[in-house]
A protein has these predicted regions:
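Core segments of alpha-helical transmembrane spans in multipass integral membrane proteins
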Residues: 53-72, 93
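Transmembrane alpha-helical segments of multi-pass membrane proteins
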Residues: 18-22, 84-101
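Hydrophobic cores of alpha-helical transmembrane segments in multi-pass integral membrane proteins
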Residues: 23-30, 58-65, 132
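Cytoplasmic membrane-interface segments at the C-terminal ends of transmembrane helices
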Residues: 2-14, 65-89, 108-112, 131-159
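Transmembrane alpha-helical insertion/packing segments
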Residues: 1-43
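Membrane interfacial helix motifs at helix-loop boundaries and amphipathic/re-entrant anchors
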Residues: 28-60, 100-127
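Hydrophobic alpha-helical segments and their boundary regions
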Residues: 5-10, 16, 21, 49, ...
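Hydrophobic alpha-helical transmembrane segments
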Residues: 15-19, 57, 86-90, 121-125
Length: 160
């Protein structure tokens, strides 16, 4: 990476990237839970008295907290830190695990659907990857001279 900031980044760009990261993270949760559910032959919430929307609520709360952490990561990067903040990466990973388990315990889920659930454990690397991908894209935008990626038909070489 270059020594100083090469390009200014608007608040709109950061918010757009943050929103895209949250959407990708939610899609990764759906995909990983679907594959895990097919492989294990079970659902994330199997307790009959607990409604399934509590799982959606738990993931929604965790995504909201991820958004706050990503905003803090962006502020750190814009202030000149050129490496991901390890506390934010670890906070996101353990935070999603804690949120899922606390929502599950408040809803009355047993330990095998909260603390020891593979569905809860797989959330941790997904949240860590989301923070790192957000950092990579934003750092590339701020600290490099590289243009935005383009599809082959968008390339400028053939037009001139």
């Amino acid at each position: 990476m270059a020594e100083g900031a090469k390009r200014g980044v608007t608040r709109g760009y950061v918010l757009g990237l943050l929103g895209a990261t949250l959407v990708v993270t939610a899609a990764l949760v759906v995909a990983s839970w679907g594959l895990l559910g097919m492989a294990l032959g079970r659902e994330p919430i199997e307790t009959p008295d607990v409604p399934l929307w509590l799982g959606v609520l738990g993931i929604g709360i965790a995504l909201g907290l991820l958004g706050v952490l990503l905003w803090r990561q962006a502020l750190s990067l814009l202030r000149g830190s050129k490496s991901p903040v390890a506390g934010i990466v670890l906070g996101a990973a353990f935070g999603v695990y804690l949120v899922w388990n606390l929502v599950g315990l408040l809803a009355g889920l047993p330990n095998d659907e909260t603390w020891f659930s593979p569905f809860a454990i797989i959330l941790m690397p997904l949240w860590a990857v989301a923070v790192l991908l957000f950092w990579l894209v934003l750092a590339r935008r701020i600290y490099t001279d590289r243009p935005t990626p383009q599809w082959p038909w968008e390339r400028r070489e053939g037009r001139e």
